[in-house]
Amino acid sequence: MTLLKRILSVVLLALVIAVGGLYWLGTRDDASTGPAAVAADASTLVERGRYLALAGNCMACHTSRGGKALAGGTPIPTPFGTVYGPNITPDDKTGIGTWSADDFWQALHNGKSKDGSLLYPAFPYTEYTRVTRADADALYAYLRSVAPVSQPNRPPELDFPYDQRPLLAAWRALYFKPGVQEADASQSVQWNRGRYLVEGLGHCAACHTPRNRLGATRSSEPLTGGVIPVLDWYAPPLTNDMQTGMGRWTAADIAALLKTGISAHSSASGPMAEVVLGSTQHLTDDDALAIGVYIKSLPATPASLPRQSVAVAPAAMELGSKIYSQQCAQCHQPKGEGSGTAWPALAGNPTVTAASPVNAIRMVLDGGYAPATAANPRPHGMPPFGQILNDSDIAMLVSYIRNSWGNEAGGVTALEVKRARAASTLN
C-alpha cells in the first residue's frame, strides 16, 4: 500500500468514526429518564396540565388561526423553510391518541417522536428538556382530556439539505444536551421557580437569545436579545444592562408586563403581545413575580447586537421634530414624557432605545394595541402611519425619537424602513 493510500484510509476511517460519533451523540437519550408519575387525583393533574400548557404557550404553535384548539396546522416560518405545528389532540389517527405518557415524555425531553424519529427544533425541546417528568405527565393528562380532532398533519416545507431529517443527528450532537433542570441549592425557591419557567417551560431563549447560522441559540450569549428570524421583530435582552436591557426595571415591573401587557416602562407589542395574550397573563401572581426575580438576577450583559452608530444630520433631526409635533406629540407629549400607561413615555423607553430600531419602526408603520388582558381589557391603541408617511419620513421621525430627551440610540436609514415595510402586516 502506498503512503497516499494509507493516508486516505486513515482519513476515511476518521471520517467514519466522526460521523458515527455525531450520530450517536445526536440520537442519544438522557439516561436520567424516569418512570411515569403516579397521579393521586386525575382532575387535579388535568387542571395542573392545563395551567402548564398556558404557561408554555402550547396554543401558539398548535392551533392555527381560526382552527380548532390544539389541532395543529400553524405555519412556523424559519430561515430554512416552513414547519407546521402538529395535531396534539388525542385523535388516534392524526393526533397523539395512541401515545403513552412515556412517548410524550420522549418528545418533550429527548426531542423524539413516538416512532423514534428526530423532531425538528422548531419545537423547542432544547428548552423543554428541562421540564420535570411530573410536569410532563400533567401536560400529557391535560392533552388527553381535550376533544380529539381529526386533522392530518401538514409535512414540513424545508429547503435542501435541511429537509433531510437524518442530518438532525449532527445538529443535535452539536447543540442539544437533554437534561432536567436541577435546582440551585444556593438560591431561593422563588428564584429557582423563575429560572425553571424562563429557561424551561417558558422557553424565553427561543426569542431572546441570538441564533447562529444553523439556527441554534448561542449558549455563550444567553438572553442577550436578537432579531426573530423571518418575523423581523427584535426580542430585547433580558439581562440587566442599563441601556439595552432590564436594568431600570424592578421584578414587579416585569411581573406587571407579563400579567397585563403594560408597565411603567413600555407595553408589549408584536410577538410579545401575542405571548402575553395567550400565555403569561394566565400565570399566577407568584409565578409572574418569580420570573421577574430570576430575570433581575441576570448579569448586566450588553445586548448581543451592537448598537447602531448611524449619525443623524441636524436637518434630519429638525424634520423629524416637525413630524413628531404633527403626528405624535398629542399622545406621547411634546418632550416624550407620555401620559400614564395609555400613552407610554418615549424618553428612556427600551423599545425606542433598543440596539435594533426595528420594533420602533414596525410600531410606526403598523401601529397596534397592547394585548387585551383581564387586568387591562380595553388597551389603548396606536394608529398605523405606514400609509401616510414615506420611508424617509419614518426614518427621520424614528431617528429623532431615538436621539431626543436623553435618548442616545443612533439614527435610522430609509433603507431600514423599506425592509421593515416589506415585512409589515399592512404591506
Model-identified regions with their sequence ranges:
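N-terminal type II signal-anchor transmembrane helix
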Residues: 1-33
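Aromatic- and charge-enriched surface segment that lines or borders ligand/interaction sites
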Residues: 96-112, 116, 138, 247-251
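Short extracytoplasmic
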Residues: 40-75
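Flexible coil segments in periplasmic/lumen-exposed cytochrome c-class electron-transfer proteins
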Residues: 25-36, 64-83, 114-195, 199-200, ...
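C-terminal structural cap/anchor segments
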Residues: 319-362
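Short, cysteine/histidine-rich loop/knuckle motifs that typically chelate Zn2+
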Residues: 60, 206, 330
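Glycine-rich, acidic and aromatic/proline-enriched surface loops and short helix-turn segments
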Residues: 110-113, 260-264, 366
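Acidic/histidine-rich, surface-exposed loop or edge segments in extracytoplasmic proteins
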Residues: 82-90, 233-239
